[in-house]
Amino acid sequence: METGNAIVAREPSQPGVVHWSFEQVEVASPGDDEILVEMYAAGICHTDIVLSSVPAGTMGIDYPKVVGHEGAGVAKAVGKNVKSVAVGDPILLSFYYCSTCQQCEASHPSYCDSFNSKNYLGQQGTMKSKTGDEQIWAQFFGQSSFAQYSTVKEASVVNAKDLIKDISELKLFAPLGCGFQTGSGAILNITQAGPKDVVLITGLGAVGMGALMTAKIAKCKTIIAVDRVQSRIDLAKTLGATHTINTSDADFSTLDLAVRDLLPGGVSIAIDTTGVPAVIEQSIQSTHARGKTVLIGVPPMDYMLNIHATTHISSGRAVLGCIEGDSDPRVAIPQMIQWYRDGIFPIDKFVEYFDAEDYSKALDSLKEGSVVKPVLIWKK
């Protein structure tokens, strides 16, 4: 058992507002298929915020819990059945999957039968409060990386000993396990975009930037980047965006018109990372016949997609859901690292580090849009 600090999420006083606090917790020794990880860094993803700002009972979610699912650290102890990691190995963390269901066996682990329950809910039994023996929901996405120590599932682990040059790279690569992987996979796996494609990307957080860089790698002929923060738009221009739209003063209901002012024929692929209902529906309308819209951003829980069925049928359009970019982390993460070394996936342009106890500042930077990917540092 280890004792360390963690960011504990408690039930919010009102929906949409997180209630996080820096607390001491006790972390159990690893089970047979688990690894005790000393965390070095963890990216903050919008999913961490969404799934700790909803009332208890939503989707089965309970409190208190520790979130965080873009972790990086070093293995301190391993269970007897663990084969992919040895004590002392640096590791990168991603989502959990069972490896035995139909989707896992078909190499689509992000659509694992147990994905929702194991990743979004986690489980009790591996972490408790230092005072009062309060059981804490942990193993969020198999990892709960907003903690100094965490007992993680082997399935969530990518061994990084042959992928990194030093510990600074381990920290830099922490966010590859979700946001960048999701955006990249939306282009690479979900849409299989190529040189003939015209791509619209709404929202330039880590997911959107991952999609943008991968669209450039895929040699898509036109890439339209949309955001409300000018600094992100300026950065997108340097990374391959051929057109940009700033929505800071725009009516979202006219986004389709703005896109068609640039490209009257519309786009072949629209990637929505915002989860804003009006943006989602305008993205769909921006696609031409047989175009694809990929939904990644999480909309309000009660939102129902508004599509005119007859028009949709005649257009041949497709609206696709996307979890983790339909990626296999043990393939996707090494690929993104190689792209980084090749200078075509420069994630260092997006990352800003914060001490773990300064998580409030990191959250503010994300909300303001001044930082694309805040990363919490657990070990300096």
Kindly give the residue locations of the regions a language model identified.
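C-terminal hydrophobic helical "lid"/dimerization subdomain
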Residues: 1-2, 258, 281-285, 326-380
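Glycine-rich beta-strand-centered segment in the early N-terminal region that forms part
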Residues: 26-42, 55-106, 110, 161-167
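NAD(P)H dinucleotide-binding glycine-rich loop of Rossmann-like/cofactor-binding domains
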Residues: 100-198, 202
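Adenosine-nucleotide cofactor-binding segment
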Residues: 198-204, 216-282
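Glycine-rich Rossmann-fold phosphate-binding loop(s) that bind the pyrophosphate
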Residues: 203-206, 298
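Glycine-centered, small-residue-biased loops immediately flanking beta-strands
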Residues: 291-292, 317
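Rossmann-fold NAD(P)-binding glycine/threonine-rich loop
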Residues: 298-316, 334
